[in-house]
Design a protein with these regions (language model features):
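Conserved class I S-adenosyl-L-methionine
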Residues: 116-123
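Class I SAM-dependent methyltransferase SAM/SAH-binding core
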Residues: 120, 129-172
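A short acidic, Gly/Pro-enriched loop at the edge of an enzyme's catalytic core
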Residues: 171-184
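A short SAM/SAH-binding and catalytic strip from SAM-dependent methyltransferases
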Residues: 183-194
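A short glycine-rich, Lys/Arg-flanked "PGG" loop and its adjoining helix->strand segment in the class I
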Residues: 197-212
Length: 338
């Protein structure tokens, strides 16, 4: 088995899915932005230094989040981010897809898995990352995801064990025994955590002693000032574009590890800005094509509207990373003590 990135067939399937979106699904999707991203929780560097407690994302298990992801996954599959994450720049000469592959090799190395070990992907999407990690390590993959449509896609993948993938919610008790896994990882779903103590505690519980927990997700950086209107606007635009929930200073992530009992092995942020520029340019082209096709009545206007809504204010995303207000790739590695 050799890992393959998103194919033309995948993209055509996503386009067909978008063209089949009902009016009810369309209106539900468009309404999720106000429901999910208005007054989302933030904890900045200043909050951390003042001892302000972490405020979780209360809508992390909501029906609105499921509705959002049913459509967002289709839109992302048109580009390079079917796996639902923007990778850090590992090799600037390579594509977004190739940098995802390089990044996943780093994750596989961090997980320290052997053949036959069990590894859990939290927020596994359609299982594409799990498939690659299994290929790299020889481990047996498991995954949970809130969106049933993506789990259905994982079930159709002949390279994944169907019974190991399920609709699940990391804001609730994980339906696995204590010490069930040799490693756990989460690639950009963790801003939907409602209660960090609970979720990190559940990860700790299902890990074997010595097991690794690797997380890569959005974090606020030192430069972000919530009282600066310009910066606050950039972050809000980026939140809506990349659909992250809570926005927390990276030290809060580190504390979530250590308070759960993990030994923090490493914690580092990486830039994705060059990857972001490429993907934004691609979706700008998609937006222009969709607008034209809708104008001449080849595709429904609602298909064009969904693309425009997702790609709205995309330049803010680039600017926010360039100003070092945030990273989409704060990478933490923790180990459960032996």
């Amino acid at each position: 088995m050799q890992h393959k990135p998103t194919t033309v067939r995948d993209r055509l399937g996503a386009l067909v899915g978008l063209l089949r979106v009902s009016d009810a699904e369309f209106h539900a999707f468009m309404g999720t932005y106000d429901e999910l991203f208005t007054e989302s929780p933030e904890n900045t560097k200043a909050d951390y230094e003042d001892g302000v407690p972490l405020r979780g994302y209360i809508q992390g298990s909501s029906a609105e989040l499921e509705q959002l992801y049913r459509i967002i996954h289709l839109l992302c599959t048109l580009g390079s981010v079917e796996k639902m994450y923007m990778p850090p720049v590992i090799d600037p000469e390579q594509s977004v897809l190739q940098n995802q592959i390089l990044f996943e090799r780093m994750v596989a190395n961090d997980l320290k898995l052997g053949k036959g070990d069990k590894v859990l992907d939290l927020g596994c999407g359609c299982g594409a990352i799990a498939e690659h990690i299994a290929e790299l390590t020889g481990a047996t993959p498991y995954g949970i995801n809130l969106d049933e449509s993506q789990i259905d896609k994982a079930w159709r993948n002949p390279n994944l064990p169907r019974s190991n993938f399920a609709v699940g919610d990391f804001n609730k008790a994980l339906e696995f025994d204590d010490g069930a896994f040799d490693a756990v990882y989460a690639i950009q779903p963790m801003t939907y955590v409602t209660d960090h103590k609970f979720t990190f505690g559940e990860v700790y519980r299902v890990l074997k002693p010595g097991g690794m927990f690797v997380m890569n997700d959005v974090a606020a950086l030192d430069s972000y000032d919530r009282d600066n209107e310009h910066q606050r606007t950039l972050i809000q635009h980026t939140r809506e574009l990349t659909v992250f929930g809570g926005f927390w200073y990276f030290k809060y992530w580190e504390d979530a590890y250590t308070k759960a009992g993990f030994d923090l092995v490493s914690s580092v942020g990486r830039s994705a800005v060059e990857m972001i520029k490429r993907e934004v340019a691609l979706f700008d082209r998609y937006e222009a094509v969709f607008k034209f096709l809708a104008k001449i009545h080849v595709i429904p206007k609602k298909t064009d509207a969904m693309m425009q809504r997702m790609n709205e204010n995309s330049q803010s995303y680039i600017q926010a990373e360039e100003e070092e207000l945030l990273t989409l790739n704060w990478h933490c590695v923790g180990q459960k003590p032996e």
